[in-house]
A protein has these predicted regions:
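Multi-pass alpha-helical transmembrane bundles in non-GPCR membrane proteins
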Residues: 6-181
Length: 181
């Protein structure tokens, strides 16, 4: 069992598990957050060299949504506080799943699709995300199937513009899109 010394008035040995709720998840999600931050920099630099602010905006929305997901998850899995605080952290952690899915759609909708189709699809996905956020805010222990339906529904919204997405992307880019889910 991991042990460390807390320095202060008393020199006491405490287990890591007493202070960190889920060390494995806390560490891996923290690493994910750092990777998201480091990956955001070159993406935003590349976007800044493209014509129009829409590139930077769409990539920033994606990057921020990814960072927020990992930050919320790291926080939830790190701090073992009162039941009330843990419930709030769990709500935020679960809300960020909807934010990430919608954030992931943002560059596809604005940069790949564009126009009326892209804006419509973006509004649909962010609308579903808002429903998911509200459900998690007010019903954190809702049945898992409800969350699953929302997440899968958001993910499958792309079939509304599948042909246009397929025709607008290179085979390699489309392969990465499929690999990412």
């Amino acid at each position: 069992m991991s042990r460390f010394i807390i320095l202060g008035g008393n020199h006491m040995s405490h287990t890591l598990e007493e202070h960190i709720k889920d060390p494995g998840s806390a560490i891996t999600h923290f690493i994910g957050m750092l990777m998201a931050i480091f990956a955001a920099v070159p993406l935003l630099i590349k976007a800044a060299h493209e014509p129009g602010k829409i590139y930077v905006i769409s990539i920033a929305v994606y990057a921020v949504s990814l960072i927020l997901l990992y930050a919320a998850s790291t926080t939830y899995h790190t701090f073992n506080r009162s039941e009330k605080i843990n419930t709030v952290l769990k709500k935020v952690d679960h809300m960020m799943i909807s934010v990430l899915i919608a954030g992931s759609y943002t560059p596809i909708c604005l940069l790949v699709l564009g126009g009326r189709t892209g804006i419509t699809l973006l509004c649909i996905v962010w609308g579903i995300a808002l429903v998911g956020i509200l459900i998690k805010a007010f019903w954190v222990y809702c049945p898992k199937w409800i969350s699953s339906v929302l997440y899968i529904g958001m993910g499958w919204t792309c079939v509304l513009a599948f042909t246009q997405i397929l025709n607008s992307m290179s085979a390699a880019a489309f392969g990465w899109l499929l690999a990412g889910g």
